[in-house]
């Protein structure tokens, strides 16, 4: 939903309506939106009209419940790392109140997946909890702009701005900026891999945030099934047409 909210519903509809017949078929929808097709097609005629599309986007929504944190963890939520008011450019920070050492702790930074077109930082809490619960690590989970709002390289610019922000605030929050691991799955895996190999690439650094004096190098990368070779990704058997103009990779 956050991916779509940055655009006017009519603009989204027009972009998805590839044959310009004023209706959306399942094949015209992005992969992540197809699961909602039957919910949007209220008259069950096998296509989505502009009125149905707008009504669905304007429907009342229940706020998502945040996973509860274990006792002994201090959470700092929705911290802006890019000096903007965009919720997609925020991170959550998790600090153990009882630490296993007096020295600054290493930090694990989680980057969510979702095909670069959906996903949210809150999905990282369950994965990070065992580490900061034990008092051995500080944890962070970041949002980044999705492809429906900004195209590449905005995503890596955001991730690097988040890393710089964390380094600039390491002393304040008591973690070791030189022992920073990044962990992600799928699209998040791609982004952490990019962080690992592009620490010295100025073209991918971006100019976001107030911590331009910091670099975006990391000391450890944990890439869970992140795509790496986009030119050949469509050559392997798959239910997804990776070379389609509507694919996340495109």
Where are these regions (language model features)?
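Short loop/turn motifs at secondary-structure junctions and domain boundaries
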Residues: 7-8, 31, 70-71
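Alpha/beta-hydrolase superfamily serine-hydrolase fold, recognizing
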Residues: 16, 40-41, 59-250
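Acidic Ca2+-chelating loop motifs
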Residues: 19-29, 42-54
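Primarily EF-hand calcium-binding motifs
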Residues: 8-19, 34-44
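Hydrophobic h-region of N-terminal signal peptides that target proteins for export
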Residues: 1-4
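Solvent-exposed coil/turn segments that connect beta secondary-structure elements
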Residues: 29, 34, 53, 112-114
